[in-house]
Design a protein with these regions (language model features):
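Glycine-rich, highly charged phosphate/nucleotide-binding loops
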Residues: 65-73, 94-103
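N-terminal catalytic cores of NTP/NDP-binding nucleotidyl/phosphoryl-transfer enzymes
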Residues: 5-69
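Classical nucleotidyltransferase
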Residues: 96-196, 259-264
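Phosphate/ribose-recognition catalytic cores of enzymes acting on nucleotide-derived substrates
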Residues: 182, 188-265
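Residues at the starts of beta-strands that form the adenosine-phosphate
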Residues: 45-49, 83-84, 140
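A generic structural signal for well-ordered alpha-helical segments
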Residues: 41, 77, 134-138
Length: 265
């Protein structure tokens, strides 16, 4: 996957099928967008591209802090087959850019075969414009329907963040493209054979079943305790998969809450 800055100029203006979105978490609705765009790019002999922001945009929009940082999002975009990632930094200048200005920049830089967005897509100054403006500007635009969960509610990032905060990790994972995970850092080995580490999450304090991935090695499932953005688990669960307990590059997958049987075992 190639990563470029939105301000870069290209002499060859590559032909692309472009998905527009922030993607601070990859839920099933996002997966639908990306899979459709990938197939369209293959059909049109074009590059499968995504435009997104590389920084936390919560200071400039009504969005809350992202679930996944940019480093993790880059990895997930690559796993989904994105060939070209076009990134911009949200700032006051970009926030003030009109929809027409943004559209003109897209036309200037790329040969866009098709743009793919969700039904709820908004852009431009104060997010006042939608996909109809893109069509008025001459783009071919595919608007994807919004997916619903088992409760007949539209799957969206805001509700997923609420589910994380409430500890309903089962429903979180049902709505995500990838199992919910957090990066581990600042690991400390305790005297009783336990590992304590920091994690970036506002997941409800509690006991969960987790798994670790580090340097392409995977652990078995194990119980852990999450409290105040820290995780505690027994060192023995590593089973020798991680040399020298270097866990600062590890990913902790949070699979489900501990059930009654697991609590008593």
């Amino acid at each position: 996957m190639k990563i470029i800055d939105f301000d870069e100029l290209y002499s060859d203006k590559p032909h692309i099928v472009l998905v527009l979105g922030y993607f601070d978490v990859f839920h099933l609705g996002h997966k639908l967008l990306l899979e459709y765009a990938k197939k369209e790019a293959e059909k049109l002999n074009a590059i499968f591209a995504v435009f997104t922001f590389s920084n936390d945009i919560s200071s400039y929009t009504d969005k809350t802090e992202p679930i996944y940082n940019f480093e993790k999002r880059k990895k997930l975009f690559a796993l989904l087959g994105v060939q070209l990632l076009i990134t911009a930094k949200m700032d006051q200048s970009f926030k003030s850019m009109s929809a027409s200005e943004f559209s003109a920049k897209l036309k200037e830089k790329y040969n866009i075969k098709e743009i793919v967005v969700g039904m709820d897509f908004k852009f431009g100054k104060n997010r006042e414009s939608d996909f109809n403006v893109l069509r008025e500007e001459g783009f071919v635009v595919e608007v994807m329907s919004l997916l619903k969960d088992k409760h007949d509610n539209i799957i969206n990032t805001t509700d997923i963040k609420k589910l994380i905060k409430s500890g309903n990790i089962k429903e979180v994972n049902e709505q995500l493209t990838f199992t919910y995970s957090v990066s581990i850092r600042n690991c400390i080995e305790g005297s009783n054979g336990e590992i304590l580490a920091d994690i970036d999450t506002n997941l409800k304090n509690g006991n969960y079943i987790c798994a670790l991935e580090c340097y392409d090695k995977h652990s078995s499932e194990f119980p852990c305790t999450i409290k105040d953005s820290k995780v505690l688990f027994k060192k023995s669960v590593l089973g020798g998969i991680i040399a020298n307990n270097k866990l600062d590059d590890a990913e902790l997958y949070i699979l489900r809450e501990v059930n009654r049987k697991e609590k008593n075992s």
